[in-house]
Amino acid sequence: MHTAPDIADCIRQNLIQYFHDLNGETPCGVYEMVLLQVEKPLLAHIMDECGGNQSKAAEMLGLNRNTLRKKLLQHKLLD
């Protein structure tokens, strides 16, 4: 049976490639970049799982509904 790599391993491998691709350049804002790139697909997937119900999605994520709404707007995931 094949098991999928966990999310942390996927992120680690992508960071290794990211730093390799920089070819010695010093990056800026890596923390925010990673959070934003992980957060958007997470929010999109959870919203799909919840059929667009923000209250249900917020509960699933452990966020306040207003916080979720702010993040959805930030990532342009709301019309």
Task: Place the predicted regions along the sequence by residue.
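Bacterial C-terminal helix-turn-helix
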Residues: M1-D6, Q13-D79
